[in-house]
Design a protein with these regions (language model features):
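Positively charged, small/polar-rich N-terminal and surface patches that mediate targeting and assembly
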Residues: 1-112
Length: 112
C-alpha cells in the first residue's frame, strides 16, 4: 500500500478530487495548509502599510491506495493540479505498512 500526500493550490481541490474519483479512489483527507517553496511569499498593502506574506495558502490531500493504483492516482493529481506556474505544489509517495479500520478492526487493503 502507498500513501500519497499532495500539496496543491486551493482552487484546484475540486478538480483533483474529481480526478481521483475517476481512477477509483473515493476516500481522501484534506487539510488546509500554509507554506512556501520556490514560489516564496509576496508583499501586500493593507491600510497603507506594506507587509510580507511569507506563507501562502495551500491544501494538503492525503490518500492511501493499493500499489497498483498509485501511479494512476499520481498522474491524475498532476494533470488536475497543474497550472504551469510556480507554486503548483508537490506530491510525496511513501510506503504504508498497515491500515486498521477502527470501527470493524479490518486490516490491510480491506481497511482502505
Amino acid at each position: 500500500m502507498k500513501k500519497i500526500e499532495a500539496i496543491i493550490k486551493p482552487f484546484k481541490l475540486d478538480e483533483v478530487k474529481e480526478a481521483l474519483h475517476e481512477v477509483g479512489l473515493q476516500g481522501i483527507t484534506v487539510v488546509e495548509a500554509k507554506g512556501f517553496g520556490r514560489q516564496k511569499g509576496h508583499t501586500e498593502l493593507y491600510r497603507g502599510a506594506e507587509y510580507v506574506v511569507d506563507f501562502l495558502p495551500k491544501v494538503k490531500i492525503e490518500v492511501v491506495c493499493e500499489d497498483d493504483v498509485c501511479e494512476r492516482a499520481v498522474e491524475a493529481i498532476v494533470n488536475a493540479a497543474r497550472t504551469g506556474r510556480i507554486g503548483d505544489g508537490k506530491i510525496f509517495v511513501s510506503n504504508i505498512e498497515e491500515v486498521v479500520r477502527i470501527r470493524t478492526g479490518e486490516r490491510g487493503e480491506e481497511a482502505i
